[in-house]
A protein has these predicted regions:
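Acidic-and-aromatic substrate-binding clefts and catalytic sites of carbohydrate-active enzymes
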Residues: 86-90, 202-205, 231-239
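Membrane-embedded segments
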Residues: 57, 61-144
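Loop/turn elements at helix/coil->beta-strand transitions in domains of secreted/extracellular proteins
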Residues: 51-52, 77-78, 104-107, 219-225, ...
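Secreted/periplasmic serine-hydrolase-like ester/acetyl group-modifying domain
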Residues: 125-223
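Residue-level recognition of beta-strand->loop/alpha-helix junctions
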Residues: 83, 229, 256-258
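Hydrophobic membrane-insertion alpha-helices, especially the h-region
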Residues: 3-24
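Alpha-helical transmembrane signal-anchor/signal-peptide segments
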Residues: 25-45
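C-terminal regions of proteins
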Residues: 241-242, 246-295
Length: 295
């Protein structure tokens, strides 16, 4: 029995030591992570490192719709697109909070979509950022105050947080600094395109709360906030109405470009039903900037 106890203690000590070592190595790698275009690297750069006068937030629709260089050329302000595939308003709020700890953008552009607001992407905001727990303060605070006890307990383990990160970390270091402005152009164009309707939109309470938090932060910091729905062949009428009513009630600048005639329905302006091609993004961004300047 004594031998079993001693072996158990030794194994536990080895596991603790291994966990500490994994944490030290992984944190060092993340702290010095090159500016790669890999999704996970994009998340780290957006949350930890990037600074610009104009911060663009949203999901993949925003990432493929807003061209930072056009903002810079027109407004003479630096711009970064922090849009992230499959991520919701909670993630957008965490990015903004993280930026405000190191800089203050002059303008925030928030591209919206139904999956950012209906709860279907909520888990991604926690799971895809877990390597930043105990590194990024807004994310750590979110987990510690909003997530279930089981999640908080798991987050104390470095092995849990970093168990699937080494592959993308190595890829990022292999790719090296690419000095990305966040925009991800799409050049493939479909042969045909039809509208895809969505029904049954219901806003998620916590995501709406974080959308309001973004508005509050921008007002408190004197940041100009612009919200928009980009041109789209994925049509959610209920979501469009809800966002328009919400922005009106909150007194927020909002434009619905879903059927923007300069972009929709021309097939070469789209890469698929839900994302603009680079050609479409260039056209749309110019229209958006023009509308911004008329405020």
């Amino acid at each position: 029995m004594k031998k079993i106890f001693i072996n158990t203690v030794i194994i536990a000590a080895l596991l603790v030591a291994a966990d500490l070592m994994v944490g030290l190595v992984a944190k060092k790698l993340i702290t010095n992570l090159p500016d790669s275009t890999i999704l996970e690297s994009d998340i780290v750069q957006s949350m930890q490192n990037k600074q610009a006068d104009i911060l663009i937030l949203g999901s993949s629709k925003a990432k493929h719709s807003f061209v930072p260089q056009l903002f810079t050329d027109s407004l003479h302000l630096s711009a970064y697109n922090a849009g992230c595939d499959g991520h919701d308003v909670i993630y957008a709020s965490l990015v903004l909070q993280s930026w405000l700890e190191r800089c203050q953008p002059k303008i925030v552009v928030l591209g919206l979509w139904n999956s950012m607001l209906d709860g279907s992407w909520r888990a991604n905001s926690v799971n895809d950022c877990k390597t930043l727990y105990d590194i990024n303060q807004p994310y750590t605070q979110w987990v510690d105050t909003q997530e279930p006890l089981t999640t908080r307990i798991k987050m104390t383990s470095s092995i849990y947080r970093f168990n699937s990160s080494m592959v993308w970390l190595m890829k990022s270091y292999r790719n090296g600094d690419q000095h990305s402005d966040g925009y991800s152009p799409l050049f493939e164009v479909p042969k045909k395109m039809t509208d895809t309707p969505f029904e049954g939109f219901k806003p998620d309470e916590e995501e709406v709360a974080q959308l309001k938090h973004i508005i509050t932060l921008c007002r408190e910091k004197g940041i100009k906030l612009y919200m928009a729905l980009a041109p789209d062949h994925e049509i959610d009428a209920a979501m469009r109405r809800w966002v328009a009513d919400f922005c009106k009630s909150e007194g927020v600048w909002f434009r619905d470009y879903t059927f923007e005639k300069s972009v929709y329905p021309e097939i070469t302006n789209f890469s698929d039903a839900g994302h603009l091609s680079d050609k479409g993004a260039q056209i749309f961004t110019r229209i958006f900037i023009s509308d911004m300047r008329q405020q």
